[in-house]
Regions:
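Bacterial N-terminal signal peptides
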Residues: 6-15
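Alpha/propeptide regions of enzymes that mature by internal proteolysis
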Residues: 20-386
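Positively charged n-region of N-terminal signal peptides that target proteins for export
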Residues: 1-4
Length: 386
């Protein structure tokens, strides 16, 4: 059995993490489980994240509110060193390229890129171009690439049909990827995103789990959150959406009548897992999403990807390869960690976001920190840091 570590066992680690902006735990939102030092996907050794944020008011009156987020499973070696991976669509009104080959091969080759719906193509092409420039030279003449690029729609706040994401932004996101703290909220691919009718965006979290055989494993999650209606919103089990009903999106369009947004969830772990096991992990991300009050509506694109950085040697070309993996009866800790980290990553995205004036007069308010604390106290769920 793999067991989740208790939060008290690692308080010294996450106390050292950089936190320029308050995160959900800083506001007193209670979560189960112990985080890594950064409480981020980059707590998984080797994983790096790079982001480019595009915010500009154009002379035409249009507003650019978009960007690119890059997740590199093996850091600078990612372009030439695959990992085991799997994906799952809870509701498929969205796009994640490269998934047919992930299903077929069980491998994720290259970075995971997040952007807006109408920039998927340019980001995909730019990743291939970057691999041609920076990867190992092709001596066979038969090299090919099927990059993984996922999207959510930021057209409420961003001039999405202005096609403002360009190849150089992809190169910048890949180049600036680091293993340090991950910026959250109005950044990268999440710059113009909205969830539960609050300003939202990028969020991340992690969990440490203990294996019976000794040592620890880490599960890290990063989300690009752009889904959900206000009333069903729950945070730490509290029906927050029913008490924070003001400050909804100002829009010149008719209000949404159902859940039509999307969320991309990326789960990373250093636990040795095979592709079919990672498929099970990817599915568990949906349970963390459900904790927030999502019901994966017909118009929502809820697409999840999981990968393991273990078994690097088995990725090398060989007639026969060997890989280690966590036993079937020992996966529950990884499942639980995935659910917990997904929930916290989404709340972190909401807490980090700031009010945003967007395209065509649209305006999205961020969740009120004071209002959230007030509702948590009302239900006895306020847990200030000690």
């Amino acid at each position: 059995m793999i067991r989740l570590l208790t939060a008290t066992a690692l308080c010294a680690f996450f106390a050292s993490a950089s936190a320029a902006e308050p995160r959900a735990r800083d506001l007193g939102v209670p979560f189960e489980g112990a985080t890594g030092a950064l409480n981020a996907i980059t707590d998984v050794a080797g994983v790096t994240v790079g982001q480019v944020t595009l915010i500009e008011d154009l002379a035409s009156g249009k507003k650019v509110r978009t960007g690119v987020t890059a997740i590199l499973p093996r850091g600078k070696q990612t372009l030439d060193a695959p990992v085991f991976g799997a994906w799952f669509a809870l509701n498929g009104n969205g796009e994640m390229t490269g998934t047919a080959w992930i299903d077929e091969s069980g491998q994720l080759e290259g970075p995971v890129m997040l952007t807006n719906t109408h920039s998927v193509g340019v980001v995909r092409d730019a990743v291939i171009a970057e691999r041609v420039r920076s990867g190992v030279a092709d001596t066979s003449g038969y090299w090919w690439s099927l990059p993984v690029v996922a999207e959510t729609w930021d057209g409420e706040l961003n001039d999405i049909n202005g096609f403002h994401v360009r190849p150089e932004h992809v190169s910048q996101a890949l180049a600036n990827a680091s293993s340090g703290p991950v910026a959250e909220g109005n950044v990268g691919g999440g710059t113009g995103m909205i969830c539960h009718e609050f300003k939202c965006g990028i969020g991340t979290a992690s969990r440490l789990i203990k294996a019976d055989a000794g040592g620890n494993y880490t599960v890290g999650v990063l989300v690009q959150a752009n889904y959900g209606m206000r009333d069903p919103l729950r945070i730490a089990g509290v029906p927050v959406g029913q008490y924070l009903r003001n400050d909804r999106i100002y829009s010149t369009a008719a209000p949404a009548q159902g859940e039509t947004g999307s969320i991309i969830i990326v789960v990373a772990t250093d636990a040795p897992l095979l592709p079919h096991q990672l498929k099970r992990i990817a599915k568990r991300a949906g349970m963390g999403l459900a904790r927030m009050g999502s019901y994966a509506g017909n118009g929502s694109g809820d697409i999840f990807l999981a990968f393991s950085t273990a078994n690097a040697a088995s990725m090398k070309e060989a007639a026969v390869s060997q890989a280690s993996f966590v036993g079937l009866e020992h996966l529950d800790g990884v499942f639980e960690a995935t659910v917990q980290a997904t929930e916290e990553a989404i709340v972190n995205a909401m807490v980090a976001a700031r009010d945003m004036q967007g395209n065509d007069g649209h305006y999205a308010k961020a969740i009120s920190h004071a209002g959230l604390v007030k509702v948590l106290k009302r239900f006895g769920r306020y847990a200030p840091r000690k």
